[in-house]
Amino acid sequence: MPAMALGLAAGMASCSKSFTDLTPQGTTTDANFWKTESDAIFASNGLYEHFNDDNMFGRGLFWFVNASDDVVTGRTDAGSAAVRNFTATGNESRINSMYKKFYQIIQRANNIIVKVPTMSISDKTKNQVIGEAYFMRGYASFYLSQYYGDQRAGVPIVTEQNMNENKFTRPANIQENFKQIESDLLKAADMLPLLTTYDASNLGRANKDAAYAYLAKTNVQWARYDKSKWAQVVKYCDMVTNSGSGRKLIDTDNPAVDFASVFYVENNYSSEYIFSVVSNKVYGSILPAVMFENTGYGLYNGWGYFHPSLELYNSFEAGDPRRKATILEFGDTFTLFGQERKYFSSNSQTGFQFNKYMQPFRFPKDQHLNPNGDYPTSNLNIPLVRYADILLMKAEALIMDGKNGDAEINKVRNRAGLSNLSGATLTQLKRERRSEFAGEYTDRHSDLVRWGDAQAAYAKPATGRQHTVKTDPNSPYTIITVWAPRNFNPSVHHVWPIPPQDVSNSGIAQNQGW
């Protein structure tokens, strides 16, 4: 395999044969592999190994979300500050590995697409594994395109046709990437089963609805350059809704609980689930603990990153229960390891903490949390796409096409106990997305960029509450500037810098202005 900055790892990823236990277990080679159904399944499991990588959906990609006006860094260092301030070089340890890791996923998918069709295994397994490979290639390419590509240059397209080339070039524009992503995800949708057909040990694998969902997400981004793609967003959102898997919001007419319960361990695979980072007590995303109080009041090793801003807190509509489900403020009552207490923080820069992923912390520590506080995973899956996003993407597409998106947006609002909108506007849609997806990988920053709102939003300071006694839940506060206004140049900062080592090794051009 050629050595190149795209990080296309030659060796098969080594992992357990169980989808839910992807602990590395040595290496394999072509000489002793690609023989049996177990080999094919083993290879497909390697597509998900990045779920256990802090540099991906632990903290890594959240540094991009953290650039938004919803979040303030917490425990700031020079590298994280550079990312948030749009002065990064791409060398920063916070963000210098995601680019190559997404290409590693693509290479693993390419290996499957090349090798599995000729294996003497059942058609069912063959279709499943190849379908997962097409999905994960499209999924990885989606994130690469969203973060690194634009109309001036796409990101290198690597498929089974050119995977062994020594050099790659950047396509003329990102629309070339979108075409490849769409092709891959359509193949995946054709080959993959509905998620409801999986047994418990395989829940979390790529599925038909996830392929349609990422097709919708791809076309939302594509519509920035081609307005006709809004109709495709509606089409693919409807394909999720009508697939037969029963995707719907968790809505029991109990607004105080329903939204919060989306992020309960027992609802990892609820009717709202489409695709998530699979996690358990020894494997998966550490994001919940990353957001928890630094050192966790001496009870558990929280890391104290990513604090909600006062701007996010104030953005919620009056009476919206999603604010309480999303944010802890001083004096709020919450349960920690079986004991009720009132929230305070010696760590928070803003006086707030994300509450969205705190359910695993309600119980005795050994029930849902990794005993290893140095890699504090939990049993809570972290959503990448959920059904509320399908509804709000469709609503946005309809509004952008001059049509009415009230039905979809009001389903989301009604679940929160809020009144119906009539003739919902794009401004109202934007607020709804902010309230629904705060602190998630759905990514407020990417929304602001594609809407053209980032420059104005980031020209304002991020503020918070400075409490006079940080250990007193009832302490009074003053409003302070936590992060100064930032200079966001929409002709440069709409994408991120490709890590310079990858640029140097591959010979591709860096994104303009970085």
Regions found by a protein language model. Name each.
Residues 148-175, 227-231:
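Short coil/linker segments at helix-helix boundaries
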Residues 1-24, 446:
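Bacterial Sec-dependent N-terminal signal peptides
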Residues 37-45, 49-52, 76-148, 168-177, ...:
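Conserved, well-structured interaction surfaces
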Residues 317-386:
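Flexible, polar/acidic helix-loop-strand segments at domain edges
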Residues 14-16, 72, 102-105, 180, ...:
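Long, intrinsically disordered, low-complexity segments
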Residues 125-131, 198-211, 422:
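A glycine-rich, coil/turn loop motif that links secondary-structure elements
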Residues 16-79, 153-155, 178, 186-187, ...:
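An aromatic- and glycine-enriched ligand-binding surface/loop that stacks and positions planar moieties
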